[in-house]
């Protein structure tokens, strides 16, 4: 048989997933943290490619994140055009300054953004423009001062109004990249406001913070990105500066995962940058890495499938 008469490779075969260890863990998995084009920075794939690759790998859900824009519209388009592939796709708003900042009006728009009956499935506080991250990046005092923070007492406006909107819509509140103490205060305040779906990025926290937020009913998120070499490359945002955040060794991340009460943890790839493999392969490598470091397969299954499916109300076809 010559090359011209061979059947074309499926996308799964092209990615080499079928024969790789850990590929079976992707069946029914949910990756709630994917960055894809269109985007201000280069990405390894576009939204449609991300959905197709997820479908070929057997994933059931995909969450699109964008630090510069509301991603709910792209998600709605992907569901309409590629819904037959069986992957539920959603987006939401990260309240970074380029996306409108911490604004109740921007939240209202995001919650209604899409086709009729659709909208954002998560609302996140800033992930880069926070004082916590600005200090980690070594930003100037003036830059730090302009960033978001949560005071020790009370909530800054318009956060109470935003909490009411999130609670009424029953979507996920993501605490963003704030300090550990801020995250605990935010979860407590969100619970008081009636928010029931809360996700806390915990890769850089200590075990006490992970235990505290999960004991309050939140889910702790752990992402592949922070355990990789990509943390060594300076990230460009809307300015010309490049900054890095500290990496997290896999054994240390495993200890944090084990601190989550009742295994209230969610695993994600946070892939899309060219320095890392595409999200599907990044997620496979992450799961295999955690398994190698001692996390049992049953626990991995809960954290990559069951927990995010419940948190994001993943729709099955």
Segment roles from a protein language model:
Residues 35-37, 67, 92-98, 126-130, ...:
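Active-site beta-loop-alpha junctions enriched in small/polar residues
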Residues 261-279:
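Short acidic/histidine-rich active-site segments
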Residues 28-34, 62-64, 90-93, 121-125, ...:
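Hydrophobic faces of well-ordered beta-strands that scaffold small-molecule active sites
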Residues 40-44, 72-75, 183-189, 209-214, ...:
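Histidine/acidic-residue-rich catalytic or RNA/ligand-binding cores of hydrolases
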Residues 23, 75-86, 109-119, 164-167, ...:
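Acidic (Asp/Glu)-rich catalytic clusters
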Residues 7-8, 280-317:
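Mid-to-C-terminal alpha-helical segments outside catalytic/metal-binding sites
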């Amino acid at each position: 048989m010559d090359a011209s008469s061979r059947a074309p490779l499926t996308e799964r075969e092209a990615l080499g997933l079928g024969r790789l260890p850990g590929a079976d863990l992707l069946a029914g998995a949910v990756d709630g943290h994917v960055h894809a084009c269109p985007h201000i920075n280069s990405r390894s794939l576009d939204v449609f490619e991300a959905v197709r690759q997820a479908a070929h790998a057997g994933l059931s859900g995909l969450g699109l994140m964008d630090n510069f824009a509301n991603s709910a519209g792209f998600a709605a388009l992907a569901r309409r055009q590629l819904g037959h592939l069986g992957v539920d796709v959603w987006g939401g708003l990260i309240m970074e300054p380029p996306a409108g900042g911490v604004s109740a009006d921007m939240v209202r728009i995001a919650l209604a953004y899409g086709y009729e009956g659709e909208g954002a499935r998560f609302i996140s506080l800033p992930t880069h423009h926070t004082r916590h991250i600005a200090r980690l990046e070594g930003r100037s005092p003036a830059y730090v001062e302009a960033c978001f923070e949560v005071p020790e007492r009370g909530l800054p406006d318009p956060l109470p109004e935003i909490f009411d909107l999130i609670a009424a819509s029953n979507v996920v509140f993501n605490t963003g990249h704030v300090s550990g103490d801020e995250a605990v205060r935010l979860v407590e305040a969100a619970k008081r406001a009636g928010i029931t779906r809360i996700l806390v990025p915990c890769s850089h926290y200590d075990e006490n913070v992970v235990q505290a937020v999960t004991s309050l009913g939140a889910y702790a998120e752990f992402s592949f990105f922070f355990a990789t070499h990509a943390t060594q490359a300076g990230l460009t945002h809307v300015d010309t500066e490049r900054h890095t955040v500290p990496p997290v060794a896999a054994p240390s991340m495993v200890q944090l995962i084990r601190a989550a009460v009742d295994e209230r943890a969610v695993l994600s790839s946070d892939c899309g940058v060219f320095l890392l493999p595409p999200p599907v392969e990044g997620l496979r490598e992450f799961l295999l890495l955690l398994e190698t470091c001692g996390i049992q397969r049953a626990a991995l299954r809960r954290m990559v499938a069951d927990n995010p499916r419940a948190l994001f109300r993943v729709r099955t076809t």
